[in-house]
């Protein structure tokens, strides 16, 4: 039996999970010293540790501030996915208050930071939402994303993903990570489901 096409896979999607560094950002990480430490960063680290995650900075993480840049088009796409009834999530190896703030602003459903084993957390999210692996997409860029991508219904690689990731992806974006890749992924899925135009009109209506 032939394997389902990427479009056929996209029609089943109810959840989209994104990596952060290299997917929602261009992969660059800006780190600055924070005199006296950052209470907000400590809060994120403590919450992540409670879920089994580990901080990305080591023991002195609270004395650092991590900054990242996000593309506005990707933010709009995540809002469009929500309007279309598709849940979103992020699973990332690093821990950053910047990511927590961006996720809160975009009303992302699932936020997991400091995660080494992305496949296990991916499985937990599926169980929590009551959906199957075939109904979930994962957007990644590097080899740490492969275990989760191998378990999802639609594995998406960003344009500048590592060759190993592209080789196993069902579909690749036309834009690089941090430069509209998430927008490509959401648009592809919503158009496959015939939900794109309605979501766009609802988005415009919310802001009229």
PLM segments and residue spans:
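Conserved functional loop/turn residues at catalytic and ligand-binding sites
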Residues: 17, 85, 107, 130
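Substrate-recognition element of Asp-dependent hydrolases with the DxDx(T/V) motif
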Residues: 76-102, 112-113, 149
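Short beta->alpha linker loops
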Residues: 94-95, 103, 116-117, 160, ...
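A general structural signal for stabilizing positions within well-ordered secondary structure
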Residues: 4-7, 102, 130, 163
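Fold-independent oxyanion-binding glycine-rich loops
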Residues: 19-21, 27, 94, 141, ...
